[in-house]
Amino acid sequence: MKTDIHSQKILILDFGSQYTQLIARRVREAHVFCELHPFDMEMAAIRAFNPSGIILSGGPKSVYEPGAPAVAEELFELGVPVLGICYGMQLMSRHFGGEVVPAGKREFGHAELLCSGQPGQLFDGFFVGGASPVWMSHGDHVSRVPDGFQVVAYTENAPVCAIQDVSRNLYGVQFHPEVNHTPRGDQLIDTFVRAICGCTGHWTPGQIIEDAVTRIQEQVGSERVILGLSGGVDSSVAAALIHRAIGDQLTCVFVDNGLLRLEEGDQVMRTFAENLGVKVIRVNAEERFLSALAGESDPEKKRKIIGSLFVEIFDEESNRIEDARWLAQGTIYPDVIESAGAKTGKAHNIKSHHNVGGLPEYMKLKLLEPLRELFKDEVRAIGEELGLPHQMVWRHPFPGPGLAVRILGEVKKEYADILRRADAIFIEELYSSDHYHKISQAFAVFLPVKSVGVMGDGRTYEYVVALRAVETKDFMTASWYPLPYEDMARISARIINEVKGVNRVVYDISSKPPATIEWE
């Protein structure tokens, strides 16, 4: 009997925390499906969602301020377990008659959590060895606990850091269990969703593939699908998944826009057309893209130009494919969340997404997005399960607009050729020195400025290439990767000696924030 992987699910209500997506990822790591929605989700929609449990996120506001974000009173009457995190705990406390006030001493960063008595099921194993390290980020605290609630934990600066009313299945923590700085936080979330909410863990790569294949077959029927294949992880996994579901009904369009990595086009064709037997049409559109980008320096406008031209080319190709009724995309869940936030005004859209932009009315193509429920790590796991090459599945993220947003300012063919060669050397050296898989993302950036140099007996005046490598768990924050000096020196020497037009290499040591990972 086929398992319904959505039958057990957790609802996460977002109050504006920078960590909310991490909550969802921790729940998924427990092999339980969840969705993230704004805090003001209507009760009718919540009842229709029928959650096995609810998590209230943190947030930047104070619960005692006029107009502070809140939930409907009926939420706590649904009879399902509720876990409040930071602001969520304070909201729950205030709702049930407790008191929340500004803290005499705010807590931001590491803290030692101490147990106040009997920890109970949620905290089983959390205090092994005494104090448990946690991550705090709050300026308010609960000064009076509501009737029926027990204080479970405290810190040196905050007397109430975890509360519970076991009889009503209500739990609250002042710290952030979703972040890596709380080492046992994933264990706490796992306990909540599985032991307390009763979810048994159907959300696994094999089950997700089986469910997606069925849904694609039901959605598409006998109609044909066209997919824009970029060679990146998301579109590659989407192509493999759809091909498993409908076989030759899928035609992939691989647009070589002249802004891809070195030999990427040939690699894509080998993997999909030759090894997997997927129908792939290769479109050489380098001149069209470079012509459209000529003279444009604004990064957001470059993204829009590239996105619009991709849609235009897909439209042309779909008209050549008989009965093409669907356009498939590799949209993933973080894209959906961020784009939805941009529409509602409840999140700040830092960069426009290449995939989630909607389709022009005239295209008359229906949209197929089989990965839209998945985070990147889940997409990779599915890619491996589908048999895609390990190197393709675990390749570092590559932006939809390609090298266009790694060339600062105007995009020119000369710049793209220089950049792709420099980038290839950088990545090759990271592999050979065993750094690649320790780094979350690495790439070269072309700087359209020249500097004076000396080669042999002659003076040079050539371009600068910047190298960027970062470590991150979630891509919301990132630290620059401390590449050893000897490796930096070797990479720099190779680029300067092997890439004509470059006489200087610099290494980016900026973290996110304040810098973003990509330069544009």
Curated annotation (Swiss-Prot):
GO terms for molecular function: ATP binding; GMP synthase activity. The active site is at 86 (nucleophile), 176, 178. It catalyses: XMP + L-glutamine + ATP + H2O = GMP + L-glutamate + AMP + diphosphate + 2 H(+). Pathway: Purine metabolism; GMP biosynthesis; GMP from XMP (L-Gln route): step 1/1. It comes from the Bacteria. InterPro entries: Class_I_gatase-like, GATASE, GMP_synth_C, GMP_synth_GATase, GMP_synthase, GMPS_ATP_PPase_dom, NAD/GMP_synthase, Rossmann-like_a/b/a_fold. Pfam families: GATase (PF00117), GMP_synt_C (PF00958), NAD_synthase (PF02540). Residues 9-202 form the Glutamine amidotransferase type-1 domain. Keywords: ATP-binding, Glutamine amidotransferase, GMP biosynthesis, Ligase, Nucleotide-binding, Purine biosynthesis. Its EC number is 6.3.5.2. ATP binds at residues 230-236. One of its GO terms (cellular component) is cytosol. Residues 203-395 form the GMPS ATP-PPase domain. The keyword Aminoacyl-tRNA synthetase does not apply. The keyword ATP-binding applies. Homodimer. HAMAP family: GMP_synthase (MF_00344). NCBIfam families: guaA_Cterm, guaA_Nterm, PRK00074.1. Catalyzes the synthesis of GMP from XMP. This is GMP synthase [glutamine-hydrolyzing]. It comes from Pelobacter propionicus (strain DSM 2379 / NBRC 103807 / OttBd1). The gene is guaA.
